[in-house]
Curated annotation (Swiss-Prot):
Membrane topology: Multi-pass membrane protein
PANTHER family, per database record: TETRASPANIN, TETRASPANIN-19
One Pfam entry name: Tetraspanin
Cited SUPFAM superfamilies: Tetraspanin
Gene Ontology CC annotation, any one: plasma membrane
Gene3D superfamilies per record: Tetraspanin
Glycosylation site list: N5, N158
Compartment(s) of residence: Membrane
Lineage: Eukaryota, Metazoa, Chordata, Craniata, Vertebrata
Keywords from the named record: Glycoprotein, Membrane, Transmembrane, Transmembrane helix
Main location: membrane
Keyword Glycoprotein: yes
Annotated protein name in UniProt: Tetraspanin-19
Family per record: Belongs to the tetraspanin (TM4SF) family.
Amino acid sequence: MLRNNKTIIIKYFLNLINGAFLVLGLLFMGFGAWLLLDRNNFLTAFDENNHFIVPISQILIGMGSSTVLFCLLGYIGIHNEIRWLLIVYAVLITWTFAVQVVLSAFIITKKEEVQQLWHDKIDFVISEYGSKDKPEDITKWTILNALQKTLQCCGQHNYTDWIKNKNKENSGQVPCSCTKSTLRKWFCDEPLNATYLEGCENKISAWYNVNVLTLIGINFGLLTSEVFQVSLTVCFFKNIKNIIHAEM
């Protein structure tokens, strides 16, 4: 009786954690697909050659797909108490654990490289911004405008970065997104006291660092849950085995 009660309790917690993993797997797949397919967001627009976005997207989609698969297998194994499926389930969780460790290491080691890439790309976008010969870059200019308006900043270091832009009607102009203006055009003539003086670099770096730390924190939380899930699966497996032996 006690052994049966223990089995029910372990099964309940296994299904609970398994359901949470299923939702997370779907979220990983969705986020990975969004990064891969949406070319109108800040992350993809400044990574033209897909040095970072494609590998990260593929890892997220692969990890999400495998998570959904092992959750479905796990549900069948747990519900029907199929021992070989429980072994497969534990192995797949261990594999996902290893992939997440690699992903965390990749994010940490590439952090400075990603920041340098964005730094160089923003400099390039500033120099080409508003060019009549580059209509294909309008998406990048729009994203830069959204960044400057949302973060209330101007240029990479400050508003003087826009001096190097040669597409203005006069040298004193800055993008309308650098000001409190609501005009929908590339450049505006606004006084200095109506212009955002702080550069965007520090604000983007702060945003990026916070999100990287958040992502790593979530990842380590998942790793802990996976260790707990594997331990529960092993306990469940042993409990089923003991029940079978007791009934023989």
